[in-house]
Design a protein with these regions (language model features):
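Class I SAM-dependent transferase core
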Residues: 1-87, 95-98, 103, 116-130, ...
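Conserved nucleotide-cofactor-binding alpha/beta core module
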Residues: 75, 79-198
Length: 221
């Protein structure tokens, strides 16, 4: 077993399983997908650690793969079915989208950094993932072209209720991510029902806030 394969097994056994992730499809996907492929060569030794990993080019604004356990727990809470359409927002190089692609019928992913989006496409091609695609778009915009979605997954946090993204959910659709407007921040699921959006807290969590989903500072005289 290679060093990366050993690290992958330890990540699943030591981080993901111990966080009450029991969906075998998610565990199998994380065991199968080489997370190091989504990480710059200089940071591959960090690929399986329990941290938010900046994968942006030097000199670019930070962009992250969130902690593996957060990805796993959000995907488990999403209850993605094999026929579901999924949108991953702020995907960076696409690891969360790749895991989701093992669960869903179709996955769209959006990323504002064109260089990272292209890297993600290259990794998807190398891994033979045919039901997932990355578009260059800002996180707050979503991807209305293929809406509505059964599930929208934020690869990060939001400080505001993402109304535009919620509008791209189908009836019964779920949006999941870290709501950083609360203290402490909490992983939250938002469900569309009869045109309204309901909120339910899942667990305490933290993640970097996605670009465009920051709270606008109030003007003070």
């Amino acid at each position: 077993m290679s060093d990366f394969a050993t690290a992958r097994q330890k990540m699943v056994d030591g981080q993901v399983r111990t966080a009450d992730v029991t969906d075998h499809r998610i565990l199998d996907a994380m065991l199968a997908l080489p997370r190091e492929e989504f990480v710059p060569q200089s940071k591959r030794a960090l690929a399986y650690l329990d941290l938010d990993l900046d994968v942006a080019e030097a000199g670019s604004a930070p962009r992250y793969l969130v902690k593996p356990v957060l990805t796993a727990k959000l995907l488990q809470a999403a209850e993605i079915g094999p026929g579901d359409s999924v949108l991953v927002v702020g995907c960076a190089t696409g690891y969360a989208a790749a895991v989701a692609a093992r669960l869903a019928g179709k996955v769209n992913a959006i990323e504002g950094d064109q260089v990272l989006a292209e890297k993600g496409r290259e990794v998807f091609s190398r891994l033979g993932l045919q039901n997932v695609a990355i578009k260059v778009a800002e996180p707050a915009a979503g991807d209305s072209a293929d809406a509505p979605y059964d599930v929208i997954l934020l690869n990060g946090a939001t400080e505001v209720v993402p109304e535009r993204l919620c509008g791209q959910l189908r009836e019964g659709g779920r949006l999941l991510g870290v709501l950083a407007a609360t203290r402490p921040p909490r992983a939250t699921i938002m469900t569309r029902s009869h045109g309204d959006i309901g909120h339910r807290t899942l667990f305490d969590a933290s993640a970097p806030v996605l670009p465009g989903l920051e709270r606008v500072p109030a003007f003070v005289f």
